[in-house]
């Protein structure tokens, strides 16, 4: 099916023809035949790299150019950024694109000027809770990775958000994009959608198992040269000899980094002079963005053509690795499975070194088939590779047979709603009532009838859980009941708008009411004791130190559980460890020191700080509404967590472009406020932070004079404190 034959405006047809896309892939053509461009709901359950995004673009462009508005929902911020960059190409068609992924208590009415809005499912839910007006103008909703409804973490939010959008805009087109799942027909029926189900791929995918020097596929075998003792490295080298690149999936961050390091000597020998020059530039950028030991290891790997990729890295480092790989200079990325979750980063060969993953409940367990299919689907770059290969590793012939049966010849599992627990449902019951989607228990059950859970299990299974949620919300003062009417209180409405678990809000309110003296530690631990906080993992070497700290600071905790209650006490110690990380962060400890002390990654520090800042913001707002102590202290800590600095630097940090390191330099040199800077000589400030930053500072505080360039040697003479920039500077 040719692009020129589609029912689309001429400028859209020209856009794609000029982009080198003259015709559709077979699954795309099937989607058009089933009503994609006629506003019909559609579920496309097709493999990775088979053109799902183009389906979304065609539906959105058809609707937007007819005066509509499109919402593109993604599961991850990184994926939102990737799609946003892609959709900005539509500016030549006069289309405006916006993105929104954070600040859960904002309406973001300004986003409404855009024609296409990219948002995470959580942000979409928060926009609905805050009654953002432009949400009612949405004419097409694209849900990327809709199979994540099966996720216990993100699934319930996505499911309820879809139900709300469909109730608010009953004539809105829903386009759901999914990996191939076992019960795609059931998911399509729930969405009242036509189903496009296909295994077609633009490049052939050869799935197989490597054993005893041979790559076994269904219908052929390939002998692999063995220049090293590591089978996976030999597979990588085999791919590089043929001009391809490799993704290697590992089960843990430690293994991920270890393999990238191990492969450096072998991969480096394959690099051209141009490769080495470009890789050196990427490595230098990595070191400019971070001073941690992990960044140093990553830069060393990148110089040799390898890299690792996991959530412990900051976003700038991950993006540098991804860009280097897309441009063909990084030959190998060793990654945790997070890379398989949506990011467009295909490779000639995908190697899955371990198909087992540790579970705290049941030890090492085989990964689901769906997860294997997601990783395998990254093999084969459309229009670049003649084929793709997905390789599992076996240590015995019996394991080879097991892997063929378990993964290669198996279909993906069915997906199941995870909405039917009190923890999952509590926040959505409150928001549904607060937003007026339901005003009685009967209306609430009618609304929940539209969820995937009710479609799979019937509403009967939800009734008992809903009663438990309603009882909790009434007891905590978030709901009132007048006869049959369910009414959200001011407390309940605020909790819903702030996008916090009602249990977290109840714990914060209780903690502020009952606390004696409110110290930094008291408030940080209160935040870390909520279910919305992501806690640090306890290592064996942590127990003694943190237990000693608890004993020395017991009066600063609202409650210390008995050490004889092993599960509760260990959970408490994790809360304390997370609090101590945040304590080091706001006291300006170097990020590398924090990483080493807590056994974490730089990216984890920023993620933990982001979540803590949000929950501390909630604490501030709740304290003000309920007239509880701690509002002022929480507001100050919220700002300090944002910047990772002491209270004396807050005035300086309000100037854009000054991070905590530069602010501390200025403060140490006697510039303790914007007023001090207003009276400073440009040369003195430039000696501390550089001429470009100095000029930006003076522009913001109302001074326009130019700052002269000074040499590196002069700057070193004028400021012995000057050091290499880190991500915190920015």
Swiss-Prot record:
Residues 33-199 form the Helicase ATP-binding domain. ATP binds at residues 28, 46-53. It catalyses: Couples ATP hydrolysis with the unwinding of duplex DNA by translocating in the 3'-5' direction; ATP + H2O = ADP + phosphate + H(+). SUPFAM superfamilies: P-loop containing nucleoside triphosphate hydrolases, Sec63 N-terminal domain-like, Winged helix' DNA-binding domain. It holds the Pfam family Helicase_C. InterPro entries: DEAD/DEAH_box_helicase_dom (IPR011545), Hel308-like_dom4 (IPR048772), Hel308_SKI2-like (IPR050474), Helicase_ATP-bd (IPR014001), Helicase_C-like (IPR001650), Helicase_Hel308 (IPR022965), HTH_61 (IPR046931), P-loop_NTPase (IPR027417). GO terms for molecular function: 3'-5' DNA helicase activity; ATP binding; ATP hydrolysis activity; DNA binding. Residues 707-730 are annotated as: Disordered. Its EC number is 5.6.2.4. Monomer. This is ATP-dependent DNA helicase Hel308.
């Amino acid at each position: 099916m040719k692009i020129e034959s589609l029912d689309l405006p001429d400028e859209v047809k020209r856009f794609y023809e000029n982009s080198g896309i003259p015709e559709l892939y077979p699954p795309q053509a099937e989607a058009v035949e089933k009503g994609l461009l006629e506003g019909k709901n559609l579920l496309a359950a097709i493999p990775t790299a088979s053109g799902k995004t183009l389906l979304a673009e065609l539906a959105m462009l058809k609707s937007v150019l007819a005066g509509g508005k499109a919402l593109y929902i993604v599961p991850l911020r990184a994926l939102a950024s990737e799609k946003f960059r892609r959709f900005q190409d539509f500016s030549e068609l006069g289309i405006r694109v916006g993105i929104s992924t954070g600040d859960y208590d904002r309406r973001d009415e300004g986003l409404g000027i855009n024609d296409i809005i990219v948002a995470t499912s959580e942000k979409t839910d928060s926009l609905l809770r805050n009654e953002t007006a432009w949400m009612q103008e949405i004419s097409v909703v694209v849900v990327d990775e809709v199979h994540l409804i099966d996720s216990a973490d993100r699934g319930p939010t996505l499911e309820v958000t879809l139900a709300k959008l469909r109730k608010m805009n009953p004539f809105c087109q829903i386009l759901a994009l999914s990996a191939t799942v076992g019960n795609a027909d059931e998911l399509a029926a729930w969405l009242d959608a036509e189903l496009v189900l296909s295994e077609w791929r633009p490049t052939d995918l050869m799935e197989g198992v490597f054993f005893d020097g041979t790559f076994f596929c269904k219908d052929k075998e390939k002998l692999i040269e063995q220049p090293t003792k590591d089978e996976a490295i030999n597979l990588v080298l085999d791919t590089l000899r043929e001009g391809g690149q490799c993704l290697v999936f590992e089960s843990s961050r430690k293994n991920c980094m270890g393999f990238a390091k191990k492969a450096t000597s072998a991969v480096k020998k394959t690099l051209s002079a141009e490769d080495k020059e470009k890789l050196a530039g990427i490595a230098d950028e990595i070191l400019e963005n971070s001073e941690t030991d992990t960044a140093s290891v990553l830069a060393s790997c990148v110089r040799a053509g390898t890299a690792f990729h996991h959530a412990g890295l900051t976003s700038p480092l991950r993006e540098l690795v991804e860009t280097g790989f897309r441009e063909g200079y990084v030959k190998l990325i060793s990654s945790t499975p997070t890379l398989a979750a949506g990011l467009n980063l295909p490779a000639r060969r995908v190697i899955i070194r371990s198909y087992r993953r540790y579970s705290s409940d049941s030890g090492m367990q085989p990964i689901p088939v769906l997860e294997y299919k997601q990783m395998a689907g990254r093999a084969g770059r459309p229009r670049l590779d003649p084929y793709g290969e997905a390789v599992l590793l076996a240590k015995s012939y019996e394991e080879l047979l097991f892997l063929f049966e378990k993964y290669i010849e198996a279909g993906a599992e069915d997906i199941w709603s995870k909405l039917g627990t009190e923890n999952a449902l509590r926040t959505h019951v409150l928001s549904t009532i607060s937003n007026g989607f339901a005003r009685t228990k009967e209306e609430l059950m009618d609304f929940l009838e539209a969820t995937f859970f009710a479609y799979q299990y019937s509403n009967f299974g939800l009734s008992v859980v809903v009663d438990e949620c309603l009882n909790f919300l009434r007891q905590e003062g978030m709901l009132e009941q007048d006869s049959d009417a369910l009414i959200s209180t001011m407390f309940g409405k605020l909790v819903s708008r702030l996008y916090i678990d009602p249990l977290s809000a109840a714990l914060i309110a209780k903690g502020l009411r009952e606390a004696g003296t409110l110290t930094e530690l008291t408030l940080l631990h209160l935040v870390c004791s909520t279910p919305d906080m992501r806690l640090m993992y306890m290592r064996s070497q942590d127990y003694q130190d943190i237990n000693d700290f608890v004993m020395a600071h017991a009066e600063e905790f609202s409650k210390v559980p008995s050490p004889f209650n092993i599960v509760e006490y260990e959970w408490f110690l994790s809360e304390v460890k997370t609090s101590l990380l945040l304590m080091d962060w706001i006291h300006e400890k170097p990020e590398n020191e924090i990483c080493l002390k807590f056994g974490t990654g730089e990216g984890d520090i920023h993620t933990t700080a982001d979540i803590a800042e949000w929950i501390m913001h909630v604490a501030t707002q709740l304290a003000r509404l309920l007239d509880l102590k701690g509002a002022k202290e929480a507001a100050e800590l919220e700002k300090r967590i944002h910047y990772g600095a002491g209270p004396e630097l807050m005035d300086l940090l309000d100037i854009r472009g000054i991070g905590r390191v530069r602010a501390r330099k200025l403060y140490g040199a006697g510039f303790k406020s914007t007023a001090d800077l207003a009276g400073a000589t440009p040369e003195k400030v430039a000696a501390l932070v550089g001429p470009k930053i100095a000029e930006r500072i003076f522009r913001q505080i109302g001074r326009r004079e130019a700052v002269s360039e000074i040499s590196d040697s002069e700057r070193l003479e004028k400021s012995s404190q000057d050091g290499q920039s880190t991500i915190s500077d920015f």
